[in-house]
Amino acid sequence: MAIRKIPTTADIYLEVDGVRVAVVQSYKVTASRESKAIYAFGQSEPVSTIRGQSQYVLELTRLYATDEAIRDGLNFCEMDDFSLVVCKPDRNVIYTGCQWKSLQESAEVGGNVLEKVTVEAGRRIENLL
């Protein structure tokens, strides 16, 4: 029996208007979706369910702003409607419409790093390579 390998991530970064502004060391995604039960008249049990909205919560660890973004005065606290791009060997996964929920910052003198950022994304797109 052949062992099938799971593709690992080759690159993770944040984009604003198509420009890479930060690299990310690791990420964790929690996807959830609401659903609604549909009841027929006189039935005590649902006859169907309707799929609701999906929600993506991403936990990003160790973010480093790019040199260009630093020169342009990037401020993570003011970032709005950005994308997270996860490059895998066979596809790119892009989370768009991102808004940050929480920021935990820790840095050494002369360093530019955000330790942990929690983000909510509006949409998930997969592009096969």
Residue ranges and their predicted role:
Residues 1-64, 89-116:
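Solvent-exposed edge beta-strands and adjacent loop segments
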Residues 67-74, 128:
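Short, conserved charged micro-motifs
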Residues 71-96:
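Short, acidic/charged, Gly/Pro-enriched secondary-structure junctions
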